[in-house]
């Protein structure tokens, strides 16, 4: 019997980076253990350092192998679970492109609209720079929906890593009433 994967994360309510691989693993139906590190605990850095060479979460443990960073975790999972990315090559390439953009971009949106998926904030007016980033996210989503399998509800029809990576943004939009 193989040891299940272990995902080391912070609180999914506040840590969008922790939420991403957790969502992906759940949607894939993968058996995994979860280690929750309270990120505001005095010893959080020491707890994380036990698992993560980068000193950050998330980290996926597979035996002695440690994979940190949500996009790297997604790619590692794709080696075992082909449903991580769309089947069609063009859609798969687009999914990887927009996932990489999500991972590396949208810093103003992240800073101006902090992640808390349980909160509801009203009266927040995004700055012009954040509005540009919001518009870019919406354009990405529209393009993915036009490219993917229209038969499913997700960005490319079926749930993929792109959905897991963009889910916290969708939740931010809900939190702040962004239309």
Regions found by a protein language model. Name each.
Residues 1-127:
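GST-like domain detector, emphasizing the conserved glutathione-binding G-site
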Residues 106-179:
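GST-like fold's C-terminal all-alpha helical module
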């Amino acid at each position: 019997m193989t040891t299940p994967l272990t995902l080391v994360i912070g609180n999914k309510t506040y840590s969008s980076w922790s939420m991403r691989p957790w969502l992906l693993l759940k949607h894939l139906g993968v058996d995994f253990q979860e280690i929750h590190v309270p990120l505001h605990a005095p010893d959080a850095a020491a707890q994380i350092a036990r698992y993560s060479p980068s000193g950050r979460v998330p980290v996926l443990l597979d035996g002695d192998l440690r994979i940190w960073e949500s996009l790297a975790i997604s790619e590692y999972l794709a080696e075992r679970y082909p449903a991580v990315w769309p089947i069609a090559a063009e859609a798969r390439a687009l999914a990887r492109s927009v996932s990489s953009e999500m991972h590396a971009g949208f810093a103003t949106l992240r800073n101006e609209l902090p992640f808390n998926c349980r909160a509801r904030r009203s009266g927040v007016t995004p700055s012009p720079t954040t509005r540009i980033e919001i518009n870019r996210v919406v354009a990405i989503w529209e393009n993915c929906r036009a490219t993917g399998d229209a038969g499913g509800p997700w960005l490319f029809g079926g749930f993929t890593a792109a959905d897991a990576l963009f889910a916290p943004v969708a939740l931010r939009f809900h939190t702040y009433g962004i239309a």
